Amino acid sequence: MSAKIIDGKAIALSVRQRVAARVAERKAKGLRAPGLAVVLVGEDAASQVYVGSKRRACEEVGFISKSYDLAPTITQDELLALIDQLNADPTIDGVLVQLPLPAHLDSTQVIERILPNKDVDGFHPYNVGRLAQRIPALRPCTPKGMMTLLENTGVKIKGMHAVVVGASNIVGRPMTLELLLAGCTTTTCHRFTKGLEQFVRQADILVVAVGKAEFIPGEWIKPGAIVLDVGINRLSNGKLVGDVEYPTAAQHASFITPVPGGVGPMTVATLIENTLQACEQYHS
């Protein structure tokens, strides 16, 4: 068996095109374009790359984009004051603070300061709680993007056994909630899980988000499984690889995301989708 590639770039492009078409419709009716404020603290190289891609995506779909590049020495109170200002701005539908923040800043307090109806990252406890209660509002971007990838396979996943390896607040935990909502029997594995291999081998759907290069051996993949690899790791030779050993996994799986070009593009596309949703549902 050789897996079909889940083309995240192509699917993300279709999402952005749908959003752009809707923005054009709004403008034609005399309605304002959605607005996204992107806040970057410090000069972390990876964060600058991510923020750049988010700003470009905004321009591409016709959003109003406001950028705030802040010194790494900014105080907690100064950052919270900026968030309050953006919360009160009627032209801004989404507020995004790029994580991680410098060590002296409390990211939990920052996330909780953003109004839930402007929390387009989907990190606020209110939005995660809505997902847990099966009444989702603004959903965390990477998990929501992966659900879009699953939908595009055409496979009916209700009743399947889904295994999520990794339990971060950003990916693993909310992805578990998304899969439960979709009717999967869901197992979450983490650093304290004993016998990881036995769980992975049972997975009809495998999601891996641990940030360790080729952490899951390809031979563990159940024949016919769907594999969603969230990891993006750079080897010493410069090659980018995921958290799953791709060449062997692709011989076992029915569908698999490549790295790069799989899950990553969907995160930004879903952020754009969430910002349009926030504009139309909460602020129009």
Swiss-Prot record:
GO cellular component: cytosol
Pfam families: THF_DHG_CYH (PF00763), THF_DHG_CYH_C (PF02882)
GO MF terms, alphabetically ordered: methenyltetrahydrofolate cyclohydrolase activity; methylenetetrahydrofolate dehydrogenase (NADP+) activity
Catalysed reactions, as listed in the record: (6R)-5,10-methylene-5,6,7,8-tetrahydrofolate + NADP(+) = (6R)-5,10-methenyltetrahydrofolate + NADPH; (6R)-5,10-methenyltetrahydrofolate + H2O = (6R)-10-formyltetrahydrofolate + H(+)
Record keywords: Amino-acid biosynthesis, Histidine biosynthesis, Hydrolase, Methionine biosynthesis, Multifunctional enzyme, NADP, One-carbon metabolism, Oxidoreductase, Purine biosynthesis
GO biological process, one term: purine nucleotide biosynthetic process
InterPro entries on file: Aminoacid_DH-like_N_sf (IPR046346), NAD(P)-bd_dom_sf (IPR036291), THF_DH/CycHdrlase (IPR000672), THF_DH/CycHdrlase_cat_dom (IPR020630), THF_DH/CycHdrlase_CS (IPR020867), THF_DH/CycHdrlase_NAD-bd_dom (IPR020631)
Recorded metabolic or biological pathway in which this protein acts: One-carbon metabolism; tetrahydrofolate interconversion
Domain of life: Bacteria
E.C. designation(s): 1.5.1.5, 3.5.4.9
Protein family: Belongs to the tetrahydrofolate dehydrogenase/cyclohydrolase family.
Function: Catalyzes the oxidation of 5,10-methylenetetrahydrofolate to 5,10-methenyltetrahydrofolate and then the hydrolysis of 5,10-methenyltetrahydrofolate to 10-formyltetrahydrofolate.
Alphabetized PANTHER family for the sequence: C-1-TETRAHYDROFOLATE SYNTHASE, CYTOPLASMIC, C-1-TETRAHYDROFOLATE SYNTHASE, CYTOPLASMIC-RELATED
Entries under NCBIfam families matching the protein: PRK10792.1, PRK14186.1
Subunit structure, interactors included: Homodimer.
Protein name as catalogued: Bifunctional protein FolD
Natural source organism: Tolumonas auensis (strain DSM 9187 / NBRC 110442 / TA 4)
Taxonomic placement: Bacteria, Pseudomonadati, Pseudomonadota, Gammaproteobacteria, Aeromonadales
